[in-house]
Amino acid sequence: KNKMDLIESVFKNTNVNTLVIDIKTDNGHVLFETDNPLAIEMNNVRSKYNKASLEELKNDKNLYLIGRVVVFQDPLFAKKHPEEAVFDTAKNTIYSQDGQYFIDPSSKKAQNYIIDISREACELGFDEIQFDYIRYPDSSNQYMKFKDESTFENRIKNINSFLSLAK
């Protein structure tokens, strides 16, 4: 059974008015066809739906669609653009915590990429975007290196910078 069959059974057996669908996953995959040059360069598009299928789903089920975008946890972006990733000075490579790779939240290139993907998703028909992992790695590892010194003030500045772009 595919995911849509499971979702259909939920619709039949419950009263659902909202659905959250991944747009950009914690693996870094974008789940719709996009012309975004960075997504194409990273070969991370895994098309699961398109504008027509979303419109059909919304209209047939009278749904409010929320698109989930994983923001700064992105192994594909971090590996393809290590200069934009959190760096581990002890291992002299990009930082990984339990297999999770993080983009440096101060990276304008990464911020713009995520915003561009999110805007494109809105054009597909999503009513709202839910940003997830809009944070720094939760480790206090002394070997993590960011472009900006990792102070409380810089962390707030960088997260707010992203949020300002998202408005």
Which ranges hold each PLM region?
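Solvent-exposed loop/turn segments at secondary-structure junctions
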Residues: 24-29, 71-75, 135-138
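The substrate-binding groove and active-site-proximal loops of carbohydrate-active enzymes
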Residues: 1, 35-48, 98-112, 149-156
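Active-site-adjacent "subsite" loops/lids of carbohydrate-active enzymes
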Residues: 1, 72-123
